[in-house]
Amino acid sequence: MASLRKTHPLIKIANGALVDLPAPSNISSWWNFGSLLGLCLITQILTGLFLAMHYTSDISTAFSSVMHICRDVNYGWLIRNMHANGASFFFICIYMHVARGLYYGSYLYKETWNIGVVLLLLVMMTAFVGYVLPWGQMSFWGATVITNLLSAVPYMGDMLVQWIWGGFSVDNATLTRFFAFHFLLPFIVAAMTILHLLFLHETGSNNPIGLNSDADKISFHPYFTYKDLLGFAVMLLALTMLALFSPNLLGDPENFTPANPLVTPPHIKPEWYFLFAYAILRSIPNKLGVVLALLFSILVLMVVPMLHTSKQRGLTFRPITQFLFWTLVADMIILTWIGGMPVEHPFIIIGQIASVLYFALFLILMPLAGWLENKTLKLA
C-alpha cells in the first residue's frame, strides 16, 4: 500500500514539491537562494506581525510607538532589528537569485521568470511603504519625493498624487494607508510565490551547464532539503549577527529624527537596496523620463528572454558574455555608490554613464555578444 504522503490530497502536493521532486544532481549553491527567499518572507511576515501588534499608524504616535517597541516591549528591540535588517537580507537574496537566473539562462522559463519580475516589483513596493512607517525624517521625505513622481503622468498626474496622499501633502491619511498596504502586500507576495513555484515545477530546475538533466535526476529529499537547511543556518547566523552587533549599520541616521515637513534633510536617499534605481532616476533631468527609467530599470528584465540570441543557454562556456555579465555587476555596484552621493560633479556624469551602460548591456551588448559567439562557434 502506498504511503500517506503519496495518497493524501494535501500532503501529496507538499510531497511533490519538497520530497519526491526530481532535481538535477549538479545544481550549485546558487540554487539555494530561492529557498532562502522563502525563509526571508516567513521571517518578515512573523516579525512584522509582532511589530504590528504594538505599532500605531498615526502621525502623532507612529515614531514614539516604534521607540516604545524598542524600549518597553519584551524583545521588541530584537524583533524590530530582525525585521529592518531582514529586509536587507531579503534584497541581497533577491539580487543573487536574479543574477543566478541571468548567468545560467533560467530566464528561458518565461512564465517563471516573468512572475519573478512581478514578485520583485511587489517586494520593492512593500519595502517602500514599510520604510515610511517609522515616520522619521527620511521616511517622510522619501515618501514625498517618490510619490511626487506620479505627478509626471500626463493629464491625471496631480490628481493621482493627491489620491495616493489622501490630501494635499503626505499626512496622516498617507501613513494609515501605507500601513494597510504594508500589511497586505506580503500575503500577495506569498500567493505569487506559490504561482512562481507552480510554473517552475512544470519544467523542473535549470542546471549550471544548461543541458537537459532528465537522465540524471535525484530526489529533492534528502539531498537538497539538507543543502537548503545549511543555507538557512548560514543566513540566519549572518542576520542575527547583523541585528545584534550593528543593527543600524545599513540604516540612515536621519530617520532617528521625527518627521518634520518644515525641515528638508540635506540629502534625501532611500535604503541601500534601492540606490541603484535611485541613481538611474537622478541621472535624467526630465520628470516623465525619470518615471519611465525607474520602471524600466526593473521591467528591462522582462525583455531579457526575448533578446536571447545565443545557441547556448547559460554563460558557463561563453567568455564574452561572461565579461559583460560581470561588467553589469560592477555597474550595479557603481550605481549603488552614486545613489548615495550628493548631486554634484563628478557624481552626476558618472551616474549618467553608468545608467546608459546599464540599459545598453541588457538591450544591445549582451544580445550582440550572443550573436558573435554563435559566429565564432561556426568557425571553430
From Swiss-Prot:
Record SUPFAM superfamilies: a domain/subunit of cytochrome bc1 complex (Ubiquinol-cytochrome c reductase), Transmembrane di-heme cytochromes
Cofactor binding notes: Binds 2 heme b groups non-covalently.
Binding site for heme b b562: H83, H182
Compartment(s): Mitochondrion inner membrane
Residues bound to heme b b566: H97, H196
Principal location listed in the UniProt entry: mitochondrion
Database matches in PROSITE patterns: CYTB_CTER (PS51003), CYTB_NTER (PS51002)
Transmembrane parts of this sequence: 33-53, 77-98, 113-133, 178-198, 226-246, 288-308, 320-340, 347-367
Keywords, in A-Z order: Electron transport, Heme, Iron, Membrane, Metal-binding, Mitochondrion, Mitochondrion inner membrane, Respiratory chain, Transmembrane, Transmembrane helix, Transport, Ubiquinone
InterPro entries: Cyt_b/b6_C, Cyt_b/b6_C_sf, Cyt_b/b6_N, Cytb/b6-like_sf, Cytochrome_b, Cytochrome_b_C_euk/bac, Cytochrome_b_N_euk/bac, Di-haem_cyt_TM
Binding site for a ubiquinone: H201
GO cellular component, one term: mitochondrial inner membrane
GO biological process: mitochondrial electron transport, ubiquinol to cytochrome c
Known partners and oligomeric status: The cytochrome bc1 complex contains 3 respiratory subunits (MT-CYB, CYC1 and UQCRFS1), 2 core proteins (UQCRC1 and UQCRC2) and probably 6 low-molecular weight proteins.
The family this protein is said to belong to: Belongs to the cytochrome b family.
Protein name: Cytochrome b
Native source organism of the sequence: Pethia conchonius (Rosy barb)
Lineage, opening ranks: Eukaryota, Metazoa, Chordata, Craniata, Vertebrata
